[in-house]
């Protein structure tokens, strides 16, 4: 009998947005074999064992390595993730994100252990508040200032590259396929992390498709806010947690002293455009930051928001902010399973990586914004997700983290 972990079969199916019936049909269509949906249900519920033949058919149909189904993994409570749900959020979307985050977390921690790298940065817990109830803006600003120090940022001034700052501190930043990458599924949140997880390396997942550079920067800062502010249970509502993370993101990207010297009640909308260009923050987020600090009145905030809406800037603001691309996980994979060709290019032995991590190559490729596979040099090509049209940004070598940049054990 094959050693199958029933939970892993369910995880793979939900990550791929397949019902038991759809998986059964996929097996019949691609493998010319029959595994009824009822049998898949019994396998997932541990009522029957999965034969080696059936496991091979399932793995081949899903294009997953056999090792994936044999691995043990701790279940992740969906409530531990910061993914923001709304009334319109499909349960299938939530399940896919939870499943992919579990896959990613397990892969990251295996590579981290393989390289002997340190896991969770101690400063996150050191800064994390423990008192019950929501924090006020001043308290969050103070914590954000201390976080900037830990990220090796100046106390004032724009953040040159939010992604690089996070990676230098040992926080992995990774695009996730399940977060709205398919047009069939409407994303309701652009970032996700798990602040309650104390084991392993912290991970910030984000959606990369059709999201502007300024929104990506804010999303990553927002998720850092969750990691720091909500590492301990503080009896907050979801809305209170979101509000705190929003305030934290604004404070990281534009410190109070900078905001006070830049924005006032008389700042015109055209001036906000120029401020966006210099700070890499959306105009809408700048208005909210100014309001939170009391730099503009409620009436002025309302007026600015009406002007933004009238100009159609809710959907597309003026000024293009460069998209930041993560590098740390890519370089970790290169060091563990291949070689680092350049700060932005890595070649891996895809067979070894997939077998060791139990993750399809297409996910490793997506999580790293692109990997080279050694097998392709001899004409054996790995399956990848379709290109989403994202344009890679040039990154100077001296701005790139390497696995050595993160503290070792």
Enumerate the predicted regions with their spans.
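Active-site hotspot residues in diverse enzymes, especially metal/ion-binding acidic/histidine motifs
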Residues: 1-409
